Amino acid sequence: MKFATKAIHAGVHPDPATGAIMTPIYQTSTYVQDGVGNHKGYEYSRTLNPTRHALEKNIAAIENGKHGACFGSGLAAIDCVIKMLNPGDEIISTNDLYGGSYRIFNTIFAKYGLVFPFVDMQNPA
C-alpha cells in the first residue's frame, strides 16, 4: 500500500453503529459495560477510545510498525518514555525546549537519578 493510501485508510473501519465510513470523533468519557470489569473494548476515554485507537493503528501502519501510541500532550509522551529508563541513564536534550519539559526533567526526573545534559543544537561542535 502506498503512503497516501495508508495515511487515509489504515486503521479506519466503517462504524458498526452508524455506518460512517470514517471513524467518528468520540468525545464521550465513559462507556457502558455489561458488568463490572466486563467492557466492550472501551471503558474510559483516558485509557482508550475508538478515535484514538484508530489513530494509533494508522500511525503504526504508516510507520510499518506493530503498534502506535498517542498521547494527550507532549509531556504525557515524555513521561511515558522517561519511565522506561533507569537511574544513571542520560537523556541529551536541546537547551531550547519547552519550559515545562525543562522543569519536569530537572525537578521531577532528576530526583530518580536521570541525567539531563542540555546542548546547544545550533552548534554542531
How would you label these PLM feature ranges?
Residues 17, 61-62, 111:
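Residues at alpha-helix termini
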Residues 66-68, 89-90, 115-116:
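Short active-site oxyanion
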Residues 1-25:
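Short conserved active-site loop signatures built around small residues
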Residues 30-79, 83-84, 100-107:
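Conserved N-terminal alpha-helix of the aminotransferase class I/II PLP-enzyme fold
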Residues 83-101, 119-120:
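Conserved PLP-anchoring active-site segment centered on the Schiff-base-forming lysine
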Residues 106-125:
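PLP-dependent aminotransferase-class I/II
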Residues 27, 69-71, 93-94, 118-120:
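General beta-strand structural signal in soluble alpha/beta enzymes
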Residues 14-16, 23-24, 29-36, 120-122:
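Histidine- and aromatic-rich ligand-binding microenvironments
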